[in-house]
Regions:
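Positively charged, small/polar-rich N-terminal and surface patches that mediate targeting and assembly
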Residues: 1-100
């Protein structure tokens, strides 16, 4: 069994950004993604009302060069304007050809 080193990019953002973020990560080279609801508390505190919408957690496994493109786009277009965080982890995957 061969394991392939890749990057797991995780983006936590306002749910209203879901469609736009999916389009961006795919355009930048991601072959797929997973989205789940997210909640918690950070530097902006907890949201006090539901009408503001929920957060989502978008995860995608990509080669390093794609991860860097995604992070650069987030920094340029999203971080200044929206409640968005992102982080990258090293992962080793089976069937790595599905991700490159």
């Amino acid at each position: 069994m061969d394991l392939v080193p890749l990057k797991l990019v995780t983006i936590v953002a306002e749910s209203l950004l879901e469609k736009k973020l999916v389009e961006e990560v795919k355009r930048l080279g991601a072959k797929g993604y997973t989205i789940v609801p997210a909640r918690g508390e950070g530097s902006r505190g907890m949201r006090s009302v539901d009408w503001e919408g929920q957060n989502i957690r978008l995860e995608t496994i990509v080669p390093e060069e794609v991860a860097l493109k995604i992070l650069a786009r987030l920094q340029e277009a999203y971080f200044p304007h929206y409640a968005v965080i992102a982080y990258v982890e090293n992962v080793w995957v089976v069937r790595g050809e599905k991700y490159v």
